[in-house]
């Protein structure tokens, strides 16, 4: 399988913004921490046959480096420090940190090494997997079809929002990791740029080249790693929130809530955290229930919800975003991150439901116990039990 051996990726910045934000925090706070992460396909796709092609792409990634114009652009952003950017200039992907194999038809991928380096593999590697699989499965699909689908959905969107005050509606592209291709994502984002409510992209390469605002703060792995970094498991989520504020005292302040369920998060999200963080991000569970809990929590703490932002990013499409906007827009600031339903929305193309998640930190297990049972990840059942006990979680959800 070498007919598509040309590199999929052309820029080190072809990744999600929060990866660089987290990498800088790891560089400054946890330079010597080691981690392991694993690939998961949440669907029934047997992707093992693509292992050789993916391995070739992994080897090609070692040639990516931060270019001078990219370095200058990052330097102009308000939250990156010179020591980190100078280190990033010298960074190269190390393919020895990645094992890719065909396990009886299933694609098996494991990453391991220093967290400061391993952290950058996830998003571009998922984008590579998605693009390689779609090249083989859907050679007939093209950019024009993706654009036609978007245009049709924008017509529906206009009808759906007719007469609605859209001044508080903000949409972001979160579509890098499961895109049909790099070309499709860029085309979709360029089209969305024409809409007044489109405010940015999570992709740093696109943000730089298209003069867009880069969007993103932190991911589950930030909270997961602290389960072993923090000496007290019950305090690990608060430790993660506090360490983030040390790195970014007054910027990049949207906190992800579902590493150990929303209820457990809110118990840790006291008045100081709630005041200093600019808002919260939803990534699993019922979005209306989650939003109501968030607003009630702010009100209980004496904080005006209108001063905070709720970001919705779980399996969204334009219609769902409008439904949530109608429900919440008068009470809180809102942003919506849409991924797969923008960048892999082509007739007869089945998007991949794929992730890469942390499974170990410093040789010990970590877990994600989200608000959606199917998103729970951990190998070690004893650790899951310890985590549930530490965070007083009432019912068992299957670890996968």
From Swiss-Prot:
* Gene that this sequence comes from: pncB
Q: How is it modified after translation?
A: Transiently phosphorylated on a His residue during the reaction cycle. Phosphorylation strongly increases the affinity for substrates and increases the rate of nicotinate D-ribonucleotide production. Dephosphorylation regenerates the low-affinity form of the enzyme, leading to product release.
What pathway, per the record?
Answer: Cofactor biosynthesis; NAD(+) biosynthesis; nicotinate D-ribonucleotide from nicotinate: step 1/1
Q: Which HAMAP family match?
A: NAPRTase
Which GO terms fall under biological process for this protein? NAD biosynthetic process; NAD biosynthetic process via the salvage pathway; response to heat
Pfam families reported in the protein's UniProt record: NAPRTase, NAPRTase_N
Highest taxon in the source lineage = Bacteria
InterPro entries, A to Z: N/Namide_PRibTrfase (IPR041525), NAPRTase_N (IPR040727), Nic_PRibTrfase (IPR006406), Nic_PRibTrfase-Fam (IPR007229), Nicotinate_pribotase-like_C (IPR036068)
* Keywords assigned: Ligase, Phosphoprotein, Pyridine nucleotide biosynthesis
Q: Does the keyword Ligase apply?
A: yes
Q: Could you tell me what reaction this enzyme catalyses?
A: nicotinate + 5-phospho-alpha-D-ribose 1-diphosphate + ATP + H2O = nicotinate beta-D-ribonucleotide + ADP + phosphate + diphosphate
Protein function: Catalyzes the synthesis of beta-nicotinate D-ribonucleotide from nicotinate and 5-phospho-D-ribose 1-phosphate at the expense of ATP.
The GO terms this record gives for MF are: ligase activity, forming carbon-nitrogen bonds; nicotinate phosphoribosyltransferase activity
Q: Which protein is depicted?
A: Nicotinate phosphoribosyltransferase
Record's keyword annotation contains Ligase: yes
Q: Which family does it belong to?
A: Belongs to the NAPRTase family.
């Amino acid at each position: 399988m070498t007919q598509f051996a040309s590199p999929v990726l052309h820029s080190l910045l072809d990744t999600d913004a929060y990866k660089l934000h987290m990498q800088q925090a790891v560089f400054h706070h946890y330079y010597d921490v080691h981690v392991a992460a694993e690939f998961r396909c949440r669907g029934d796709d047997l992707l093992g046959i693509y292992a050789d092609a993916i391995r070739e792409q992994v080897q090609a990634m070692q040639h990516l480096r931060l270019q001078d114009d990219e370095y200058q652009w990052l330097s102009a952003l308000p939250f990156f420090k010179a020591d980190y950017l100078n280190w990033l200039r010298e960074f190269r992907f190390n393919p020895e940190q990645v094992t890719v194999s065909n396990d009886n038809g299933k694609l098996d991928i494991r990453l391991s090494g220093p967290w400061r380096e391993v952290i950058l593999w996830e998003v571009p590697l998922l984008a590579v997997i998605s693009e390689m699989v779609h090249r083989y499965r859907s050679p007939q699909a093209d950019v024009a079809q993706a654009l036609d689908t978007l245009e049709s959905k924008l017509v529906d969107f206009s009808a759906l929002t007719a007469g609605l005050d859209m001044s508080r509606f903000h949409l972001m592209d979160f579509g890098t990791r499961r895109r049909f291709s790099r070309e499709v994502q860029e085309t979709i984002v360029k089209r969305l740029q024409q809409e007044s409510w489109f405010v940015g992209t999570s992709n740093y390469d696109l943000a730089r080249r298209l003069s867009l605002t880069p969007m993103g703060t932190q991911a589950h792995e930030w909270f997961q790693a602290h389960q072993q970094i923090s000496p007290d498991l019950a305090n690990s989520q608060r430790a993660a929130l506090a360490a983030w504020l040390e790195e970014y005292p007054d910027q990049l302040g949207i906190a992800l809530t579902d590493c150990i369920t929303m209820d457990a998060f809110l118990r840790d999200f006291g008045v100081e955290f709630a005041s200093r963080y600019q808002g919260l991000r939803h990534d699993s569970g019922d979005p209306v229930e989650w939003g109501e809990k968030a607003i009630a929590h702010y009100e209980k703490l004496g904080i005006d919800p209108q001063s905070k932002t709720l970001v919705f990013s779980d399996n969204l499409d334009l219609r769902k975003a409008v439904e949530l906007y109608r429900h919440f827009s008068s009470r809180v600031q809102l942003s919506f991150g849409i991924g797969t339903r923008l960048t892999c929305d082509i007739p007869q193309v089945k998007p991949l439901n794929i992730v890469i998640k942390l499974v170990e930190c410093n040789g010990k297990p970590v877990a994600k116990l989200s608000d959606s049972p199917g998103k729970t990840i951990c190998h070690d059942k004893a650790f899951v039990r310890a985590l549930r006990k530490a965070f007083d979680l009432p019912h068992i959800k299957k670890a996968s």
